[in-house]
Amino acid sequence: LRRQRQMCIRDRIDETDLELYQAIVTVDASTADMYLKNMKSLFMEMFKMADLVIFNRCDDNTNMGSFRRSIKAVNPRAQVGFERADGKEMEQDELLPYDVNAEVIKVEDEDYGIWYIDAMERPQVYEGKTVEMRVQVQRSPKMPPGMIIPGRKAMTCCEDDMTFIGYLCRLNHTKSKTLKRILNNEWVTLTAQIHSEYNEAYDKTMPILTAIRIEKSEPPKEQLVYF
């Protein structure tokens, strides 16, 4: 039924001379958490094509970081804003669970989703930094030689809607004591340097990794990333 309604709306737009310029979604932050817990799949569907998402009626207890990561997981291009009941914009400084100024940023298994979204939103903060994390390797014959995608599987809406999230990684003179060849779907501990490059698909600057060291690792107890 939902798909039929969506098709009906598209048909009506196609019948006019109107051009869809921007899709804006507004969300009542005071009830958003309830919908995320009880109707996540339906709730997240409306964000997939949004250009801008505004959470209104926010207060000091609003979990802005969690809401932002949930939106970015299904639609990385969407801009996400937060407003108080009086219309004033909320400050969005989020306390990160790792030291972004450390010599090596150590991302724990449960914090991968936070790092992934923050690096996407603020690539300049991570420019030139070194990161260490446990990830799963994705390889494809279609990828350029010497490239992998290290990342994690994330549940963005429900168990039937899982997405592999990660950034491209170059293997240039990468060191390893435990691996002669990196296999597809293999779990590794990756130490890499982060840089930023323009991504044509997303029309924005995105992180790209250069591997320094890769070592064989056991899978984490919880292999999925949740938002």
Where in the sequence are the language-model features?
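A general "mature secreted/periplasmic domain" signal
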Residues: 14-16
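OB-fold and OB-like single-stranded nucleic-acid-recognition modules
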Residues: 10, 19-35, 42-44, 48-227
